[in-house]
From Swiss-Prot:
SUPFAM superfamilies: Anticodon-binding domain of a subclass of class I aminoacyl-tRNA synthetases, Nucleotidylyl transferase. The gene is cysS. This is Cysteine--tRNA ligase. One of its GO terms (cellular component) is cytosol. A motif ('HIGH' region) lies at residues 32-42. Belongs to the class-I aminoacyl-tRNA synthetase family.
Amino acid sequence: MSSLHIYNSLTRTKEPFKPIHPGLATIYVCGPTVYGHAHLGHAKSYVSFDVVVRWLRHVGEEQGYKVRYVQNITDVGHLTDDADEGEDKIQKQARQERIEPMEVAQYYTRSFYEDMDRLGVERPNIAPTATGHIPEQIALVERLIESGHAYESNGNVYFDVNSFEGYGKLSGRTDQEALQSGGRVAERSDKRNPSDFALWKKAEPGHIMKWQSPWGEGYPGWHLECSAMAMKYLGDTIDIHGGGMENKFPHHDCEIAQSEAATGKPFVRYWMHNNMVTVDGVKMGKSLKNFVNLKELFGKFDPLVIRFFILQSHYRSPLDFSEAAIRASQSGFEKLQETYKRLVESAEGKGQLDVATFEQKITDALNDDFNTPVAIAVLFEFIKALNGALDKDGLDAASKSGAQNLFDSYAGKVLGILKSRDELLAGESGESAQTLNDVMAVLLELRKEARASKDFATSDKIRDLLMERGIEIKDTREGATWSKKKA
C-alpha cells in the first residue's frame, strides 16, 4: 500500500488519507475522565493513538503538512453511567475521599500524564479541560436551541434527536435499540423523547461543580465538551476523531448530532476506534473491578515492555491481558535493544544489507491502517538478517548507517519501542533491568506488610536504604511506586 489508508468506522472501509486543509492534519482523541489512576485499557488507547500521531507526522514531513493533536481532559460532567441520571464521577470520588472535586481532577490528571510519560506517549499539542471551556459549551447549547435542535425543560437542556436525521449513523443503533439495551437512555418526564440526551443539567442541591447559565445553575452533559473543544481548536470539520470502541454509542453519535446540527457541516472525516483490553475474554474496566493499574504494572515491568506488548496487537483488535503474555513480549523487546546495541558497537566490515527493502515493508504496514503488529514482525525479520550479516562479515559504512537509521526512525521515533542510544550503551541490559523490577516488587511488598503491621521502623529503613542507592519511593493512594533519582 503506497499511501496512508485509514479504516473509517463511519463508512466501514479503508480510505486514503488526505487532510482537509493543505499543510495541516487535525486529530482529536477523547481523553480520560480523571477520577482514578490509569489502567491498561487507557494505555492501549493512548499508546495506539500515539503511534497514529507519530506516523502522521512522519508522513507529513514528506507530504508537507503538520499535525495538530488535541486530547481533552474530562474533569466534570461524566456521569456514573451513560444515562442522563447518576452522580458525576469526579464529584463521587471527591465525596468518598472527602476533598474538593478539583483536587481529585488535578491529582489524577498529574497521575495520568506521569503514566503516559513513562509509556513514551507524547503530549498532545493542546490538552483542554472541560471546566476550562464552560463558556464555549454554553454558546454551543445556545446555537442548538436557536436552530431548533435543542430545548430547555425545568432547567435542563436536551438535544432533540428527532430533529437530526442522521442520529446513530456511526454505531448503526436506532432509538428503539437504544431503549432496549438498558442503562444507556434514561426516561424522564421532562424529555420530549426518551432518547433525547442532556446538553446541560440543572444542578440539584448539594451539587458542587456548577456554573451559571441562561437556564440557571448547572453543569454540562458528558457529550458536549468534546464538540465544543474540538471545533474551537480544530474547526467545524476535523480530519480524524479517535476514541475507544465503546464510545461509538452514545458518546460519538451524540457528538456528531450536536456538532453537525450546529454547523450544518460534516463534523469528522475519519472516525477511528481502538478495541478493548480483556481479562480472560471479559472487558477490563473499573466498573467490573478487573482492571490492572499501570503503576502496579510498572513495578513489575519496564513501561516500554508494556508499550511493546500493546503494539504487538492491532489497535482495532482486542488485547487479552496476562502477566505471562507480557513476559513473553519482554524477550522480544530485549532482543530488539540488544541487537541495536550490538549494531552501534560493531566495527566496520565488508558486508552489505538491503535496508531499503525492510524500510519499505515497514512503511507499507504502517500505511495500511497503522498495522503495528506487521511492522514489528518486519522489524524482527530485519533483526534476523542484521545479526546474520554481523556474524559473517560485519557491515560496511553505508549499510551500518542505513541500519541505524531504520532503528532510530521506525523502532524509535515512530513506534517508540527503542531505548535511547545513551541509555542502552551506558545502562543496564534488559535482563538486569527486569531483575531490578522483580527485586523492587518484593521490597515494596515487604514494606507494605511492615506498614500494615505498624512496623514503621522497618518500613522507613527500607525506604531510606533505597534512597541511599538512588531509588525513590513514593506513597500514593493506590500503593507505593518507585523510580530512579535523576543524576
